[in-house]
Amino acid sequence: MLFLLLSVQLLSFLPCSFSASLSVAPAYSTKQTCLSESSASDSISAQLNKPITGGQFTFYGIGGRGACGLDIVTPTKSAAGSGTLFNSNAAWVESCLPDARYLLNDLVCINRCVKLQYKGNTLTVPINNKCSECAKDHVDLSEEAFNWLEPGGGSVGVAKNATITYVKC
């Protein structure tokens, strides 16, 4: 018993940190949507795989279809990317989804994700919406994604000092 007590006391002096990593896939594949990367408009490629330090993230809590034409609550952890990542000349095309909805044929909407590193945790989520007022160093997350990264939830408001990297999913 004394050994166990001493062991616990010794462990309490050791620095401990825990980290987690989660990667969420897009709701649909290009095969399911019939969108083609080769025919899509492109404004995001110049930003891919370039970490942005000192970034911030916020959250939104509304449903519906986002700027890509996809349901913004599917998957439940997702992101709205900066309006500067979207090509204003991108065309809306009919998809192969069962409801034949129109989708934005823009690379930012086709298997593109944002990876956020914050307080030792890493979350990678698909971009399925646009945050017009956000700069490239600001990502607007679904509430569930925000809460996964920031345990303080909505009381934090704007989470700061994140590293943001736009990547292929």
Predicted regions and their residues:
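Cleavable N-terminal signal peptides of Sec/SRP-targeted secreted and luminal proteins
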Residues: 1-20
